[in-house]
Amino acid sequence: MCNRVLAAFIAGIVASITPLALGAQEMLSPDPADLILRNGLVYTVDATNTMTEAVAIRDGKFVFVGSSKDAMKYRGKKTRVIDLKGQFVLPGFNDNHVHFASAAQFLEFNIMRAATQQEFIARVKDVVSRLPKGEWIMGGFWGAYDQWAAGSTGGGRREAFTPDMRAVEVLTKDHPMFIRKFDDSEFAVNASALRAVGIDPSDPKLPVAARAAMEETRRQGTEPAGSNIEGVEFLRDAGGRFTGHLRGRGVRSLFASVIPRKFSHERRLQQTRNALAEIRRFGVTNVSDMSDDEQLDIYRELHKAGELTARIHFRPGLERWKEMSDRGIKVGSGDEWIRLGALKGHIDGIMGTSTARFFAGYSNDPTNHGKWRPLMVDDKGNFVEGKFLRYMLDADHAGLQMTVHAIGDEANSVLLNYLEELNRQNGVRDRRFRLVHAQVVAPEDFKRMGKLGVVAEVQPFHLSDDMRWMEERIGRERSKGAYAFKSIKDSGAVLCFGTDWPGTSASEYPINPMLGLYAAVSRQTLTGEPAGGWFPEQRISMSDAIRAYTYNTAYANFEEKIKGSIEVHKVADLAVLTKNLLQISPRELLDTRVVMTIVGGKIVHGQ
């Protein structure tokens, strides 16, 4: 009897506590994830560069980072699980410097690397297939790599390429076409473009007919200012036929009244969609952009429509500091998708045109020291002490971040002087002042960069492109401080990477981060020259290069708490690659592909 009572008593206790136990277990079980990636090599780029196996993502954020076994605890009925099968995962690439609107237009049509008429015709066919009738085809930039026996991309040629406009005449009959050589020494047009300015391209007396057309526009009072047919040379072949090519100072003014000053909004929308597709296939999940205000509006429009597949850090010009301040914009303004609060200024020119500012003259042009930009000079081009500093002081006082272009050694030194004065007048604080490009730095200025807490916003692929002619222009001694990434890092400055996409009219800088990583760790051209690397003591490790392309750019944007590494609570932005970047040679980087890009927990590239 006692045993039966005791058994009943125990059964009652068990029955009463079992629901409690199950409830406790449910409380301990995590909410299901939307997506789990398992069995990978997950390089987190956290404080200790942890390598792990899996991540779980919910509502666009990482909720778990760790072992594949533990990740499966986040599996629910609707959770998608992807077996990575050992593939390499790292945070999405954060590009520190792009000109997105220009890149979007460049992607639409460019023949910078075209070497044959077949390539030219194929690219014309492609752009025609994507444009509504009547839209102008512009851009081009042919011949940029003809000047090199072997360009940094291996695409250099000895024979000059000139597009055959007659070969695309039928293709482009519904599209006026006005394209340019990379140095603006020559232009090419089709018949539709000529007709747009009242010129009959079939007239055997073409210059005479063109002159008559211009005179008629003068009589009608519709001639654009500066139009002058006398400044246009119509190029002909050996048989005397017009080739479609033009030269001369009057070419631009001849077409100024008919070429659209800006693309339509719909065209820019489509260009942006195409450019977003381009960057996500290379694992880029965040860009720092210096485009116009319409581009910012387009980002917002796409975000509202759910089509924005990259995060945007947007930078207007430094001269607009008061406008930004009056609108209440400061560091941190915006949200996780579109962030404002930084401004872009310029100190000097660029190496490509020998306008970067140096203490000593250029080795190949000793009287030329380069040029200061407009915010540094008066209306006559004379240097004005303190003019640029005034902009810095005011913008800084308004709570805005400054990012300033400086390339030559004098430009970088002067900018560091200004930063020291900024600290003296406005006080020392966490500004994360971004010294943009920092291409050539004097030996004594590296320590100052670290002491001042500078963020060096560099684009390593510039190195692979520029090393071909750098010593010719500034000599070997000054070149020791060119793209000196190791010296910058060792100084204590923060090194962050990007591309300067799409480049200039003379050089293309692709958005592909693998090219920048390759340049930073090898210091070679893409053809592998020189064998040991150009000033190889300035090479950095792969882990440092990856950090510069991920976490450090997030830090530069004041966003390291929400992005830049694979950690719980951060936004789920990542890239899955075909190769383990930590275990391959620099050359293998050039064959490494991105098989999946995830932004905010959504797969935007790959399966």
Language-model-detected regions and their locations in the chain:
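Non-cysteine beta-strand/loop elements that form the S-adenosyl-L-methionine
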Residues: 99, 337-355, 453-464, 522
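Boundary of Sec targeting at the N-terminus
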Residues: 24-25, 602
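His/Asp/Glu-enriched, well-ordered alpha-helical/loop segment
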Residues: 393-403, 410-433, 437, 443-447, ...
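Bacterial N-terminal signal peptides
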Residues: 7-21
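N-terminal secretory signal peptides that target proteins for export/translocation
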Residues: 1-6
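Divalent metal-binding segments
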Residues: 25-38, 43, 47-326, 341, ...
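Acidic (Asp/Glu)-rich catalytic clusters
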Residues: 303-306, 329-338, 426-428, 449-453
